[in-house]
């Protein structure tokens, strides 16, 4: 997108009226390679003077920035790249580098002091990295959540007793990160006890050495996104995602098969409850713990008869929710993240579109179980009135776009209503072809009844 010999301190282009414009160049590095990172890069590339690099990126991010072949676990290589390319801002997409301490690495290295980074340090990332820690935090600071019991091999009998004390279904959560697969919801008590034993025996490796047993919360789930500089915050557009592989919320859990934003039941009254009961106590708690948190907080909430409860904290944006949310954020997103990193979010104007975004995720045949990779994709050049965010794509030797993951591409459309937006999204999704392509046909249908 940008030539290698681009001026070092400025970016030049013509605006919509053909006027020559010059802006201070801002080199931005987005870490990650999925649909979330494509959406972040897509939005950041619209900022004045932005030159966006993505590590590792995918076939879609190559259209909005420059892909860089650096592993997310190689902090030294990331540092060297930031220095060489004079990176101004780093945006961390996935949770693993945050839990592994990439923000601490940046803060502690004198050579990187001029580089801003969006995300919490290792302590802050424990809100997602350890469900037991998150539960203790919520209890300590009065954040509403489900009743729970933390169990390991030393108190297994007490864990069994807790299971017997609550009603089905039974919720078992691996304490640590388990690639989104560490939560089991079971209807049979004996099966729950059996699976609890398997988890403690290493079903999810070290992640399930401790298991959090939770009382099941009934209601409708919603994802609420907060951007905070530690003192101030803004609520980004909320979204509802669809976890199950099949229509009608049937079949296996996935990373997410689609999203809708905004969510009809997230009224001003409901969101005020979220702020007063959850966001403000969470930020107060982080400050009390001495955690300087500058980044995203993704609140996985349950709406139980108009009352919000926290199911989980995440310390980054959601996927596929980001693919819907980013299309509704107005203004210069890099300015917003700059202000976040600088501790001056209160000084920046933030606005969001009133239109509805619907995202439909196309996945590989067989996903979320075994699937093929390398399937040639077609129809991408036929798309109109949508943004297609690549999740699992790459280029083959002949420069064809091919599949490289279970979740392949997210098609996002806007409309005045859910019905209008989903109509466009599905119309365009049908144009994308590859062997085994699969997607849900009911994204947003449940919410249309509420709108």
Task: Map each language-model feature to its residues.
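Solvent-exposed alpha-helices and their adjacent loops that cap or buttress functional pockets
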Residues: 20-23, 45-46, 60-62, 110, ...
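Generic C-terminus detector
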Residues: 393-398, 402-451
